[in-house]
Swiss-Prot record:
Its EC number is 3.6.5.3. Belongs to the TRAFAC class translation factor GTPase superfamily. Classic translation factor GTPase family. EIF2G subfamily. This is Translation initiation factor 2 subunit gamma. The gene is eif2g. Residues 7-203 form the tr-type G domain. Residues 181-183 are annotated as: G5. Mg(2+) 2 binds at D19, G44. Heterotrimer composed of an alpha, a beta and a gamma chain. GO terms for cellular component: cytosol.
């Protein structure tokens, strides 16, 4: 049997409205891999950010798309051949979790937009998530029309047409629409075929400096462990460039807040890579794709409870600066979208003094606008971020009781 590198090589976001079946679809696609998370729990490294890895396989001698499967055994009893392993990022579809979806989008190479055939199109978060993909610049998209087993043919065809109308003029205009039933595992071969053709593994330069966006961090020590048994803190995230190996030096920015003579400042953390876990395997080195668990020499009190989520880690001396304030070019949407209360309205210009919620990479922070001019503004941040010039920033404004996506900024 052909061996496949089980480290995922591409991150695919699953986005869409709450209850449209994203998580069920992950289970159908990750096949026999769904129990790996309990294994991670036993080993003390749970690096699950709504992530699941799936190995796509092909049955020899069968034409596409019927040849595609996630099962190791084909229908005729022969062994399937692995093609590639992908990592699915399951983005929350609930409107209050939009910031989580946006921070996940920063590490997606492509996306599957899940739309239920049982409801009219678009639902609130379907629209908001598609707009977010458009803003962040994710162009490799496949649309899964889910739950087709729950409607009759006429309703399914009508819903299909609604989807076509909805995506017209958006980044998903040419995306294939695949009717599926995640619950009954119907048309998974067609969906894999579409993903294989529409969401290729990006060309990455292994010679670039290692850079990782931290999405989680934790202390894996059990209460009562002796000093000799203590392990360093673990950082979970996605490597976006370069290669990381056990023994490498690691710098983490912004780092931690220290109090110096009544003044607080942020100082980078420096440590070494003690262990690496990719997929559910311990590895000596890792490349971009999937979620990575990095065991470090850091005091576990610095990493517990996701304390380092949103930070950037990489080769010492190569990271962008830590910023307490920045200026950005602003591109606002025409209207506020994704509201279920019907408070959609025109997006007004950003004003000096107003608070904004900003997502930069996997970091979400609140900033106060210190100066606003047409097409640009300056913000002072409550929590600093590590970001380089040209970084994309998702801008959210308080509308009613919720934060709403109103545009995208480019750090200048």
């Amino acid at each position: 049997m052909t061996e496949v590198n089980t480290q995922p090589e591409v991150n695919i976001g699953l986005v869409g409205h709450v209850d449209h079946g994203k998580t069920t679809l992950v289970q159908a696609l990750s096949g026999s891999w769904t129990d790996q998370h309990s294994e991670e729990m036993k080993r003390g490294i749970s690096i699950r950010l709504g992530y699941a890895d799936a190995t796509f396989r092909r049955c020899p001698g069968v034409d596409a798309p019927e040849c595609y499967t996630v099962d190791e055994e084909c229908e005729d009893g022969s062994e399937s051949e692995p093609i590639r392993t992908v990592s699915f990022v399951d983005a929350p579809g609930h409107e209050t979790l939009m910031a989580t979806m946006l921070s996940g989008a920063s590490i997606m190479d492509g996306a599957v937009l899940v739309v239920s055939a049982t409801e009219d199109v678009p639902q609130a978060q379907t629209e908001e998530h598609l707009m977010a993909l458009d803003l962040i610049g994710i162009e490799n998209i496949v649309i899964a029309q889910n739950k087709v087993d729950l409607v009759d043919r006429d309703r399914a065809v009508d819903n299909y047409r609604q989807i076509q109308e909805f995506v017209e003029g958006t980044v998903a205009e040419d995306a294939p629409i695949v009717p599926v039933s995640a619950q009954q595992e119907v048309n998974m071969d067609l969906l894999i075929d579409a993903i294989e053709s529409e969401i290729p593994t990006p060309d990455r330069d292994p010679g670039e400096s290692a850079r990782m966006y931290a999405a989680r961090s934790f202390d894996i020590n059990r209460p009562g462990a002796t000093a000799a048994e203590l392990k360093g803190g673990v950082v979970g995230g996605s490597l976006v460039s370069g290669e990381l190996s056990v023994g490498d030096g690691l710098e983490i920015r912004p780092g931690r807040e220290v109090d110096e003579e009544g003044q607080t400042e942020w100082r980078p953390l420096e440590t070494t890579v003690r262990s690496l876990q990719a997929g559910s395997n311990d590895v000596e080195s890792a490349r971009p794709g999937g979620l990575l668990g990095v065991g470090t020499g850091l005091d576990p009190s610095l990493t517990k409870g996701d304390a380092l989520a949103g930070q950037v880690a990489g080769e010492p001396g190569t990271l962008p600066p830590t910023r307490n304030e920045f200026e950005m070019q602003v591109d606002l949407l025409d209207r506020v979208i994704g509201s279920e209360e019907g408070d959609d309205g025109d997006v007004e210009d950003i004003n000096t003094g107003e608070p904004l919620m900003l997502t930069v990479g996997t970091a979400t922070t609140v900033g106060a606008v210190t100066s606003a001019r047409e097409g640009e503004c300056e913000v002072s941040l409550k929590r600093p971020v590590c970001a380089e010039k040209g970084a994309q920033i998702a801008i959210n404004r308080r509308v009613g009781a919720r934060w709403r996506l109103i545009g995208v900024g480019t750090l200048s």
